[in-house]
């Protein structure tokens, strides 16, 4: 997959002359191409003879046959297009000289009309070209290697001298008719003069084949000099100790995301940092490609700065930017900077918590491990720091001896320095034979704080099959004890192609692509790497290559092959010891003094504190008011004031202080909400949970300090402890006259508007803590909710019920028909469900003889979120032995009425009135009771009962425009009619009795009416508040109903209950006749307070920002 976006690198503004390099390159390139064709083909030479002679005479050097000149012009064209300044200088020099010659000829006169036209036209073209090149000077910013001009001149002189000497020797051996005194001048003219001197100046001629050889020597010298001149600057500087130390610090702070991050410490790479020092890119330059490895290191927020600095560097030296092994996050950052991304393959990640050798998918690994263990192999795992120097030397010798290449390969996914003293956190996994001899090893580098990434894999030719599988498996199985949660194995190139091509129904292109990869795997380990990782059932994480333009993909690919060591060029410096001389660390970071010259990691806490002290926290983008408060906090700390001290209990709450006598000494604590400063006297409003009080700070009454000190140190929202005497202000306002005060909590973020508070409902949900701090109504709601919960417990306890707790994590979801949340327990490698209801466990207690039991706790249903639904909610379930569903009518009404009394002071429910107000509605007394069929009949205007057939019910539903599903039975259609026509239209609290049996699988059939279950629902103002059953205690009937539910679940119904065999077995021990109640406590709170579920819950579920 490739995604593209035009790159717009900051810092280089688009100029009106931005087209000049490309135009100059095209112009010279056309001449180079035609010159090459003319040198090859006499036909082309004949076709272009007239324009070529004109261009050669008046505009630009254009000989009819010269391979050397064609090649030189091609290099010049490429250098111009790459914006190299030396190419601009050469072209400008050539044009200026040509213009001077044309001007001289024009001034000399005596030419024909055709010659005058050519010279005037050529001079005009040269003048225009000079002006354009001068105006476009700033567009040629790319540098070449230092001293390239002198090196090129030296190569030309040396090459020319060698060519002249060799040619002189040849002409002495085969002089032909050439006079002895003309031989050296003749060959010099041919080799370095390109035969510009007239042949008639020399006496005689050598053999014809010698002239071609003399020209070839000169061409080779010129070509070599041109290559040296236009070569891109190499990145000669590698990591210094300070650079490596900074990178290690960034890895400790931000290295958890990229498994390849530690490989950025390879010392044969160069590095460039973001200006802030919080991100860096390591790279190497090969064949004009600046190849970055993996993601930028450091804070992802600073990646754009690092990428921009890297792209600027590429532009400066004319390098083509390329990236190998970027993660999805890194590729996105490079793409946003304008590069393109191409998926290369996938990295195999093992999660030890999910790893197991059991199961059919792991059969191959399990058998390999068994073979290795039968051969007597054991595994030893150690950190490098725990290995002695002598052992490490032996380890290095073994690794070198078992290597199947002459030197270590790797660039983006290998470290290449086993046993380095700086890598003490690396992990060594060894396989030992029965004689304790090492027969294989893995070395893994750190990946953040809890992961490792494979660096080196070696095995002895004599090691038994399954050795590698044994080491990987043991590492995964022992990972928890080693503090490892992630293991990065090998990289599989083109993994998706193997999988897609092998799928049933794969298209011809996918199959052909897979066949090609399998074919080339005979020479390169493409398929082998994929298969060797796939057998561990890893998570596959994609890795990307990034590039600037599609035309440079081959170049980037070759550069990658060179960097990884698969292709070694002549004069390669791959095995050179790399030590940088010029630190790339920004001065700001170096000035901290935290970096180490030996490359070891700096004090990370010091780096973090230094960044915060500079007011530039890498974790956050801070608003201005927050920065002001942070600066104030810094000043308080520098003055020795602890802004977050140990707590001391106040003597009074605000409410108690307000009731205290005048002159009473009190101490209160709370949040400052308002401040009014009148110079020597300052008034503030302090609020705790019980209320709000005015505090008065008078310079004459303070034991120490002044009111101005309070004003300077305290911001709105700060927590303050006030001690003083109760009294009144001059206006008679009850106040606390402060003697001393103490800051107990500095608020670093400003509170909302003091008059309006939080007006956005979503903001109130997301920042409930702020809402509670400033909104008295929110505090009243949370208090009312607490009163309801307490009242429910007290009412049930007074009736002899005991409260229990049953499991929230359940192996089978049951007790209600709802979609559950699913989680996973690693210890037993099994899925669990967050309970949708505690019913089945409470009934187990009933079987055990607990006659009156209830649970008030959380339940979870993976359903919608609206005015009355939240995925996590509070549910009451209670069971009373030797009772039925009618017993719970009075008990449920009593529960709700008592809760309303506790929350509102009277048995009233708050209902919306006009203007957004709430008004109380009396809910005392006895509530209405109706059967479901009677209520539906009233709504339809036609009598129905449990015997009404399905066709009639469907006809009535169609007439009422109530939709239903074809697979529903009569009971389900009745329930749908009830929900639309009865429940949603109910006002006053009403009990609806006797539901169809088919929609009540856990309910006892009615004792006298077939097809009816003994169940009621309590509904008030369109919301179901609770339900009660005469519980089904017949284990045989219970099994039949749950088996029906399990069949629905197997058929794909996500809300159907599963078969709980343990529950059914418990029921077979006999459960007494029982009446059960289920009540949504959140909805009862809604009824009593008149608010939505999101308002009454302290922390309802909210979408992330």
UniProtKB/Swiss-Prot annotation:
GO terms for molecular function: ATP binding; lysine-tRNA ligase activity; magnesium ion binding; phosphatidylglycerol lysyltransferase activity; tRNA binding. Its main location: membrane. It is found in: Cell membrane. Residues 1-603 are annotated as: Phosphatidylglycerol lysyltransferase. InterPro entries: Aa-tRNA-synt_II, aa-tRNA-synth_II, aa-tRNA-synth_II/BPL/LPL, LPG_synthase_C, Lys-tRNA-ligase_II, Lys-tRNA-ligase_II_N, Lys-tRNA-synth_II_C, NA-bd_OB-fold. Mg(2+) 2 binds at residue 1024. GO terms for cellular component: cytosol; plasma membrane. It comes from the Bacteria. Its cofactor is Mg(2+). GO terms for biological process: lipid metabolic process; lysyl-tRNA aminoacylation; response to antibiotic. Pfam families: LPG_synthase_C, tRNA-synt_2, tRNA-synt_2_TM, tRNA_anti-codon. In the N-terminal section; belongs to the LPG synthetase family. In the C-terminal section; belongs to the class-II aminoacyl-tRNA synthetase family. It catalyses: tRNA(Lys) + L-lysine + ATP = L-lysyl-tRNA(Lys) + AMP + diphosphate; L-lysyl-tRNA(Lys) + a 1,2-diacyl-sn-glycero-3-phospho-(1'-sn-glycerol) = a 1,2-diacyl-sn-glycero-3-phospho-1'-(3'-O-L-lysyl)-sn-glycerol + tRNA(Lys). Residues 604-1105 are annotated as: Lysine--tRNA ligase. PANTHER family: LYSINE--TRNA LIGASE, CHLOROPLASTIC_MITOCHONDRIAL, LYSYL-TRNA SYNTHETASE. This is Lysylphosphatidylglycerol biosynthesis bifunctional protein LysX. The chain crosses the membrane at residues 20-40, 62-82, 86-106, 117-137, 154-174, 186-203, 208-228. Mg(2+) 1 binds at residues 1017, 1024. It is a multi-pass membrane protein. The gene is lysX. Its EC number is 6.1.1.6, 2.3.2.3. Binds 3 Mg(2+) ions per subunit. Keywords: Aminoacyl-tRNA synthetase, Antibiotic resistance, ATP-binding, Cell membrane, Ligase, Lipid metabolism, Magnesium, Membrane, Metal-binding, Multifunctional enzyme, Nucleotide-binding, Transferase, Transmembrane, Transmembrane helix, Virulence.
């Amino acid at each position: 997959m490739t995604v593209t976006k035009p790159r717009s690198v900051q810092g280089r503004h688009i100029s009106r002359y931005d087209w000049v390099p490309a135009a100059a390159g095209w112009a010279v390139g056309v001449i180079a191409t035609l010159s090459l064709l003319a040198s090859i083909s006499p036909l082309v030479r004949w076709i272009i003879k007239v324009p070529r002679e004109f261009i050669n005479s008046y505009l630009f050097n254009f000989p009819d046959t010269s391979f050397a000149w064609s090649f030189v012009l091609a290099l010049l064209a490429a250098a111009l297009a790459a914006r190299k300044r030396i190419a601009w200088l050469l072209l400008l020099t050539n044009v200026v000289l040509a213009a001077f010659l044309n001007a001289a000829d024009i001034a000399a006169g005596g030419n024909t009309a055709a010659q005058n036209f050519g010279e005037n036209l050529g001079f005009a073209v040269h003048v225009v070209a000079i002006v354009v090149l001068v105006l476009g000077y700033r567009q040629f910013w790319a540098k070449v290697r230092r001293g390239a001009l002198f090196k090129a001149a030296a190569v030309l002189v040396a090459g020319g001298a060698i060519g002249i000497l060799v040619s002189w020797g040849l002409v002495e051996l085969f002089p032909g008719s050439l006079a002895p005194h003309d031989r050296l001048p003749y060959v010099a003219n041919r080799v370095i003069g390109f035969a510009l001197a007239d042949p008639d100046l020399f006496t005689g001629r050598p053999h014809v084949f010698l002239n071609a050889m003399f020209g070839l020597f000169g061409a080779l010298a010129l070509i070599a000099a041109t290559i040296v001149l236009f070569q891109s600057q190499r990145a000669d500087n590698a990591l210094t100790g300070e650079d490596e130390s900074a990178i290690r610090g960034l890895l400790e702070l931000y290295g958890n995301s990229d498994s390849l991050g530690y490989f950025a410490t390879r010392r044969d790479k160069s590095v460039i940092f973001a200006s802030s020092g919080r991100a860096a890119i390591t790279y190497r330059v090969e064949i004009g490609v600046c190849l970055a490895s993996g993601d930028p290191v450091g804070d992802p927020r600073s990646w754009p700065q690092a990428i921009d600095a890297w792209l600027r560097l590429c532009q400066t030296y004319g390098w083509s930017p390329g990236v190998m092994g970027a993660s999805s996050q890194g590729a996105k950052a490079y793409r946003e900077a304008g590069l393109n991304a191409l998926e290369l393959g996938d990295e195999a990640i093992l999660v030890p918590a999910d790893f197991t050798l059991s199961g059919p998918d792991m059969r191959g690994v399990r058998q390999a491990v068994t073979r290795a263990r039968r051969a007597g192999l054991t595994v030893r795992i150690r950190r490098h720091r725990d290995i002695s120097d002598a052992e490490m030397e032996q380890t290095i010798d073994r690794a070198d001896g078992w290597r199947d290449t002459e030197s270590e390969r790797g660039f983006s996914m290998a470290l290449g320095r086993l046993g380095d003293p700086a890598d003490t956190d690396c992990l060594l996994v060894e396989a030992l034979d029965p004689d304790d001899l090492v027969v294989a090893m893995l070395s893994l580098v750190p990946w953040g704080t809890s992961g490792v990434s494979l660096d080196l894999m070696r095995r002895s030719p004599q090691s038994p099959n399954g050795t590698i599988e044994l080491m990987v498996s043991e590492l995964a199985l022992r990972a928890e004890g080693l503090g490892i949660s992630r293991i990065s194995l090998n990289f599989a190139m083109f993994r998706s192609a193997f999988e897609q091509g092998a799928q049933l129904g794969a298209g011809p292109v996918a199959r052909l692509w897979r066949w090609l990869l399998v074919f080339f795997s005979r020479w390169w380990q493409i398929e082998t790497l994929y298969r060797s990782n796939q057998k561990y059932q890893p998570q596959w994480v994609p890795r990307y290559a990034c590039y600037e333009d599609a035309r440079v993909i081959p170049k980037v690919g070759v550069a990658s092959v060179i960097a990884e060591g698969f292709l070694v060029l002549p004069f390669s410096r791959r095995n050179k010891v790399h030590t940088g001389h010029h630190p790339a660390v920004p001065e700001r970071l170096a000035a901290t003094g935290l970096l180490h010259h030996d490359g070891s990691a700096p004090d990370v806490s010091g780096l973090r504190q230094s960044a915060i002290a500079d007011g530039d926290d890498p974790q956050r983008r801070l608003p201005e008011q927050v920065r002001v408060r942070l600066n104030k906090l810094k000043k308080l700390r520098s003055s020795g004031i602890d802004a977050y001290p140990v707590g001391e209990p106040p003597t009074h709450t605000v409410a108690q202080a307000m009731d205290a006598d005048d002159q009473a000494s009190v101490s209160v604590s709370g949040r400052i909400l308002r401040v009014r400063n009148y110079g020597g006297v300052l008034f503030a409003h302090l609020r705790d949970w019980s209320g709000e009080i005015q505090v008065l700070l008078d310079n004459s009454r303070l034991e120490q300090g002044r009111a101005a000190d309070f004003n300077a140190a305290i911001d709105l929202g700060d927590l303050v402890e006030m001690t003083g005497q109760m009294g009144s202000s001059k206006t008679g306002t009850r106040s606390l006259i402060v003697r001393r005060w103490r800051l107990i909590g500095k608020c670093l973020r400003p509170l909302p508007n003091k008059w309006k508070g939080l007006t956005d409902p979503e903001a109130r949900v997301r920042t409930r803590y702020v809402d509670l701090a400033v909104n008295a109504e929110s505090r009243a709601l949370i208090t009312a909710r607490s009163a309801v919960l307490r009242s429910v417990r007290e009412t049930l306890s007074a009736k002899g019920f005991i409260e229990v707790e049953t499991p929230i994590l359940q192996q089978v979801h049951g007790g209600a028909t709802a979609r559950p949340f699913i989680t996973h327990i690693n210890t037993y490698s099994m899925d669990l469900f967050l309970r949708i209801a505690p019913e089945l466990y409470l009934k187990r207690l009933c079987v055990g003889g607990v006659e009156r039991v209830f649970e008030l706790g959380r339940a979870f249903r993976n359903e919608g979120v609206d005015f009355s639904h939240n995925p996590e909610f509070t549910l009451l379930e209670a069971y009373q032995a030797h009772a039925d569903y009618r017993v719970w009518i009075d008990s449920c009404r009593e529960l709700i009425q008592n809760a309303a009394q506790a929350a509102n002071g009277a048995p009233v429910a708050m209902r919306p009135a006009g203007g957004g107000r709430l008004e109380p509605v009396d809910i005392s007394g006895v509530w209405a009771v109706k059967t479901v069929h009677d209520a539906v009949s009233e709504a339809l205007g036609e009598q129905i009962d449990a015997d009404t057939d399905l066709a009639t019910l469907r006809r009535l539903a169609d007439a009422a425009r109530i939709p239903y599903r074809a697979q529903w039975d009569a009971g389900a259609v009745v329930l749908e009619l009830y929900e639309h026509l009865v429940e949603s239209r109910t006002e006053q609290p009403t009990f609806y009795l006797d539901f169809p049996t088919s929609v009540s699988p856990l309910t006892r059939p009615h004792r006298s009416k077939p097809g009816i279950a003994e169940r009621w629902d309590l509904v008030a103002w369109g919301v179901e508040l609770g339900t009660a059953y005469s519980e089904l205690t017949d284990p045989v009937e219970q099994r039949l109903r749950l088996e029906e539910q399990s069949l629905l679940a197997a058929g794909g119904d996500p809300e159907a209950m599963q078969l709980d065999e343990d529950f059914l077995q418990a029921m077979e021990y006999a459960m007494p006749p029982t009446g059960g109640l289920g009540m949504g406590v959140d909805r009862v709170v809604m009824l009593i307070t008149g608010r939505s579920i999101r308002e009454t819950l302290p922390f309802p579920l909210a979408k992330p920002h």
